[in-house]
Amino acid sequence: MVGAMANNGRIRSAFPVTNGSKDLTPNSAPASTTGSEYGPVEFTREDVETLLNERIKYKSKFNYKERCENMMDYIKRLRLCIRWFQELELDYAFEQEKLKNALELNEKHCVDMEVSLKNKEEELNMIIEELRKNFESVQVQLAREQTEKLAANDSLGKEKEARLSVEKAQAGLTEELGKAQGDLQTANQRIQSVNDMYKLLQEYNSSLQLYNSKLQGDLDEAHETIKRGEKERTAIIENIGNLKGQFSALQEQLAASKASQEDIMKQKGELVNEIASLKVELQQVKDDRDRHLVEVKTLQTEATKYNDFKDAITELETTCSSQSTQIRQLQDRLVNSERRLQVSDLSTFEKMNEYEDQKQSIIDLKSRVEEAELKLVEGEKLRKKLHNTILELKGNIRVFCRVRPLLPGENNGDEGKTISYPTSLEALGRGIDLMQNAQKHAFTFDKVFAPTASQEDVFTEISQLVQSALDGYKVCIFAYGQTGSGKTYTMMGRPGNVEEKGLIPRCLEQIFETRQSLRSQGWKYELQVSMLEIYNETIRDLLSTNKEAVRTDSGVSPQKHAIKHDASGNTHVAELTILDVKSSREVSFLLDHAARNRSVGKTQMNEQSSRSHFVFTLRISGVNESTEQQVQGVLNLIDLAGSERLSKSGSTGDRLKETQAINKSLSSLGDVIFALAKKEDHVPFRNSKLTYLLQPCLGGDAKTLMFVNIAPESSSTGESLCSLRFAARVNACEIGTPRRQTNIKPLENRLSLG
């Protein structure tokens, strides 16, 4: 069998150890680079070191063409060397695999031989045992016959007649004994032959083990050779990287020299085409800049018109007030006229004419009041539009404040004592006053919603901001406030109640309706949804169908969801489930699925307290087939976990860890806002998963709006004051003008340098 193995599949010899100037190629198959312009090439250690230490000499320092050609030749030789090393590595891998296969085959053969020998040994032992039993039975029978023979001899005189029969029996027994002895001798011979075969198999097994040891040694030597080859290859790759850096620098110098040399410009037609295309793009950029300047001037003109409208509105309000006074005077006159009608001696006809005139005057005044009210509404719409435009130009984060109604069991008189709303024209609908320890704290935001405001009223104020996502902007809306202040109600609403739907389902309904209406203009949109939560500084995928991937007993997701921001400002979360959606009904189903997976818990401050930050992301990709314009918008809707004090929440155990993680991440958010407000060079976005995820939204690339939710009861005055102060600081942050992500489909074949 060994001979058969040697003849049929000869094991490839091990690679030689490379020392000094010996060849780096294996004995069996020397590596060569086939198909290169240099023909088959083999490298030694001296060749590689000479190639890496080679210094190119140039006839002229400024002859860039010669330097470029020499460098290209040098790079080709380096690539040839690398290719040779790669082939050498493949040979090593092939030899290693072949040795492994041969070793496995021999080991398997040895195991099979050992099993067969053990089986044969057991069979022979059984045969020997059976022969021994037969021999013992024959000996017993022989002893019995000899006893009978002695007894027969003693009674020979008396039993002469039986002597003949005894002799016959003795002769038969002697014959059987001879046969038994012959069988025993045959069995001994078979045992001897089996023992000889066993010794031969043991010797063959020993030779196989020696051969296996030799193969293992050859394999170890091959491993060492491969390791040394890998180390040398790593060193060569590092040197090649350095050479690539030098080559890149030389390429930059060459490009600079090409730009100043007219003869090379004529030879490099591709460079001329690239410059021409760059000029076209530069002209487009200039046109965009001019268009933006025109838009800025237009906005300035609209701002001037807004001021004029404001003055006109003030005049209309004054006129309205005077007209209201006139109406009251006319009404008084009408009453007096009616009284005079009763006592007057004038004719009924004259009194009726006067009454009709006064009635017509009242109708005219009412129509003028209605016109003034319509102009006032239009002026308010224009004011909102200009205010949003000014905020976008300034780059501020918009802040809306919402005060939730009192809950059953809370003191109904608390709100009037702690929270009030100014009635001045400047602060109407935008101001809120908080009383603490008989001290009044006044705040002004972009919008303030009283407890009577409905979900529809709140959504109306942000509908234009949501529309920006379809226009190609990044939009971020997040709710902030203490636990139990109504953040989740604002964002999600109350399931099953159409009137109390939250901002997230309303935003999606508006986006799907607008997408449908824009189809007539040639727009096609694709929408993708993802939902995650940040629980104890760990990201969980709420749309994952694998429950173990969403949550484990320890509360830590086994998957690693790393956050990455690319050069375009887009955010990617590794291993996060992203689903295409076609209707708001699909998104509602996904929201219900995410709500079931989200972490909630009971504390002393809230029966259903969110124990994690919930992030809903809608990615919008739109293309207009007629204009070939593309837009990419993102809508982030975030329900932050509520801040809480341990003394009030009474959290212990896991709830305590959750509270500490929530407060830490919100504190990191405060540090980021503080750094942005002070315009510091370093903003600590990486201090928490929440701030790092919100970096594009807080860094100036997005339109960002924050809801600060306030609880009206007096026991929450301290937390409400902290929330309002934080919101005021957020409102004062200037993070930059948001960028619209839109472009024209790029050309298929764009010329590039080099």
Curated annotation (Swiss-Prot):
Major localisation: cytoplasm
Q: Which CDD domains match?
A: KISc_C_terminal (cd01366)
The annotated regions of Polar residues compositional bias extend over 16-36
This protein's record includes keyword Membrane: no
Q: TM segments?
A: none
The UniProt keywords, alphabetically, are: ATP-binding, Coiled coil, Cytoplasm, Cytoskeleton, Microtubule, Motor protein, Nucleotide-binding
Which InterPro entries does this one have?
Kinesin-like_fam, Kinesin_motor_CS, Kinesin_motor_dom, Kinesin_motor_dom_sf, P-loop_NTPase
Q: Matching PROSITE patterns, A to Z?
A: KINESIN_MOTOR_1 (PS00411), KINESIN_MOTOR_2 (PS50067)
Amino-acid positions noted as binding ATP in the UniProt annotation, renumbered to this chain? 481-488
* Coiled coil (residue ranges): 85-209, 262-394
One GO term describing the cellular component: cytoplasm
Q: Where is the Kinesin motor domain?
A: 396-733
Superkingdom, natural source: Eukaryota
What are the boundaries of the region Globular?
1-45
Extract the ranges annotated as region (Microtubule-binding): 74-86, 207-754
Region described as Disordered: 13-39
Q: How does it assemble?
A: Bind to microtubules in an ATP-insensitive manner (in vitro). Homodimer and heterodimer with KIN14M/KATB (in vitro).
Q: What is this protein called?
A: Kinesin-like protein KIN-14N
